[in-house]
């Protein structure tokens, strides 16, 4: 089984997570849509978004600060995020800030088959809260991914399931973000429908 390397910037890892499965509390969902959020991304005023989060005491700041957060998943705004490699923020005494990836869409997998249950799990038209809380049953925050020390296993496991060729992975602007970056990635719908 291929290991997922979380020591990559969000814009690369977000594409690689497409086709992987999230296993949690006995449920399995294939990731179909992701959004990358680089730590050093600038907002409309030209400030780093991580700086804005800290100055506004944003909840996302604590779970994205420090190299020890790489490979951690967390629920923020009712949605599942994954912290990955970022860099040093110059604004706050060279503090390490992680990039993060939002899991915006997923499809249920049962008995190694993709199940067409997209209405509640297509987060553009559905409610992202449904996947995290109702379907996967994630209630706590800052969960390590794929942790196994012999006695303790993590609550959330992300594993290799399918790989998609670059021509089957599309990109566009992120939802509710006012810049031109195409950091939203998704598997071509026609490609998924062939598997159902």
Regions inferred by a protein language model and the residue ranges of each:
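Conserved, well-structured core segments that form or line functional sites
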Residues: 1-196
